[in-house]
Amino acid sequence: MENDQFTEKQQQVTTSPTQDNQGQSKAEPVPVSQPLSPTNQTSAQPEMATCDISEELNRQLEDIIKTYGSAASLVEKEGTTAETDKPEKEDVGSMEDAECEDVNEESEKDKPAPGDASRAKEPSASKEQKLEKKILKGLGKEATLLMQSLNKLTTPEEKLDLLFKKYAELLEEHRAEQKQLKYLQKRQAQITKEKDQLQSEHSRAILARSKLESLCRELQRHNKTLKEETIQRAREEDEKRKEITNHFQGTLSEIQAQIEQQSERNMKLCQENTELAEKLKSIIDQYELREEHLDKIFKHRELQQKLVDAKLEQSQEMMKEAEERHQKEKEYLLNQAAEWKLQAKMLKEQETVLQAQITLYSERFEEFQKTLTKSNEVFATFKQEMEKMTKKMKKLEKDTATWKSRFENCNRALLDMIEEKAMRTKEYECFVLKIQRLENLCRALQEERNELYRKIKQAQLPEEVNGNDILEEDDDANTNPSSSEQASIELCAADKNMLQELAEAFRVSHKAEETLPSDGSNPETCNVQMCEAISVPELPSHLTSQPEAGNHCEQFSMSTSAPPEHMPAATENMTTLIENMPKPTKSMPMPPEMVPTPTESVPIPTEGVPTPPKIMPATPESVPTLMQNTSAPLGNMPASTKSTPKAVEHVDDIAELFIPDQPAEQKGDTDMEAVD
């Protein structure tokens, strides 16, 4: 009953828009030569209200479908449950077949043979059978059959075999029953779950039905209001048509009287009127053809409505025959209803468009006489303007092409400038890092120099006390080399050794860095090499007296450059000390010429990149060596053996910064790579 009520409501919903369309087709207006009155404007407002109401109803229906789901989902669920039930039924059937086979085998085994019956008739076994029958009356048929089969056998071994077989069969039956019990328990749980799901779906369906009933009632009310409005509009339009026809007939009679009076003068006007009448006839014919077309469309819609009604009757019969197809038909009908609503909306829109066209034709008919005179002039001016615009368009196209080419060139130049800027920033960072390293080394060497000054002053104090001894030593110095000169020579040798060690350490670090970027694949290591090559300044020529020692002095002076404010002035004794320095022998290690010069691997900075500040100029005045740090009274100073190991230790600490094998250098290299 509920399903029948629902289908009837759907029929009402589907028939209502067709009836509205029929009423509207009957009430279509005739082309009028006057503009719309204020009554037409007021009638447009309820049309908007009806459209809003229909949209709200459609939204409510979509919300119901979304919340309670469509019929397709329910059909899919039923299909899945049916598919799961099929293999379960097959399993149950197989289990029942196996049980039947076991029962048949037992019945065949339990059938007595004729030979056994003859043996049972013996008088010796009759008494025992009576006793066993009394015992087995309470056990049942199975126990009696088992005892009969045991009595038929003679030996106890056969009886034991039979008992073992029977026990094995019973075990198999017991296991099969347990499996079946587990399966039935699972099946029961599934059925309970399905029952809960079906109950929830049933409740949801009831709620959906109640909401759909309320929607149907609202639609019926809406359809009634629409019918009343269409009837009122039809009446108003009929009255307007009558007024327009009366007015038109009066104007025609007046025109005929004027034509009779002034027929000779107004022949030209008659011709124009005939032409206009022909145009009016053509417009009226077109409108009639459109009305006929609309009537055909409405008839087609009525036929479709009849077909839909027939389909609904068939669906009701099918509902009585098979309830399973109810959900599919429900979905089908809902889809059809939505389609019909959309079609009704489209027809309403077409009707409004046609009415607007009719009003436009009426206005154009009034203004047609005025526009004919002005059209030729406007057409000529329009042609001239079009020619001017074509010329302007050609010029603008040329300008756009030139500007596009300029824009592309500017983009390419800008990309090149960005790449150059990135390279220059990397180089600048490398320069800054190297400058910081050199400043740290200069500070360390200044501290060493200050310590040496202190030691020299401490050594000068006992020399002033023993002035006589110093004068004698000066006299002897003219003839033979004194102990102070020997001490100075030893200090020079120690300084040379320190320089060699620093040079070797620096060379080892360069080798380690050159082996890593051999393929040139890592850009970070290549940048580190470029920065290290740039940081090696050139030494003045007067400090490199010997070719082998010159390389060492250049490498050490790179790390000992300091501001010229803290450096002592070079004296005349410097030249004598440099001349007295021993030349390198075969035992001294010669540093390989692997240190890159600043001009070999360093790119020349362009004008756009900021140059680093000139903190350390490589001039003879501002780049002092260890030989310049020695003061004038060094020649008279005795040999101090205690100060050299400390200096060597400090130099070794400085050399550790350059040796890659030690962990401190590894940390420094990693920091440099991170900065690059």
Curated annotation (Swiss-Prot):
Specifically expressed in skeletal and cardiac muscle. GO terms for cellular component: cytoplasm; extracellular space; sarcomere. Residues 93-105 have a biased composition (Acidic residues). The keyword Coiled coil applies. Promotes neurite-outgrowth. May be involved in intracellular vesicle traffic. Belongs to the taxilin family. This is Beta-taxilin. It comes from Gallus gallus (Chicken). The lineage of its organism: Eukaryota, Metazoa, Chordata, Craniata, Vertebrata. The gene is TXLNB.
